[in-house]
């Protein structure tokens, strides 16, 4: 639906892609072996109730892990990197640094998601090669002889409507589909 693809929605957990990049670039994520420590408090999703390495926190879409990461990055660095990455239209305030992708006025369209992933894939984002390689690894969902599928899900309720995302790319030989 091309009309719907032009409408902005909350990015929800698809923002974990950019959040991971920013965490790596600022040094708040040391490397792909970094562990998000569970605080012992019961979570909305039982799989989040343990220490998680970066890839698991990303793939299990651990909201508490990524909210903590955003707080550690801080408002100034988050705002600066969002401007550099050009990830949709994020509306970030100091008090919402750990929630702006889940609730509020931040939006991204399907076309903007594709543009962001294409710039990532083509190494046109202002991130280091190291960050690119780590994010590429954690995005990988499935690899077969004939293809590689990479992506991220997201889900948010906005204006009393559910919005689900799957953003990613499929590599088949020399072709890439977003």
Model-derived features: positions:
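A conserved catalytic-loop motif detector
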Residues: 103-151
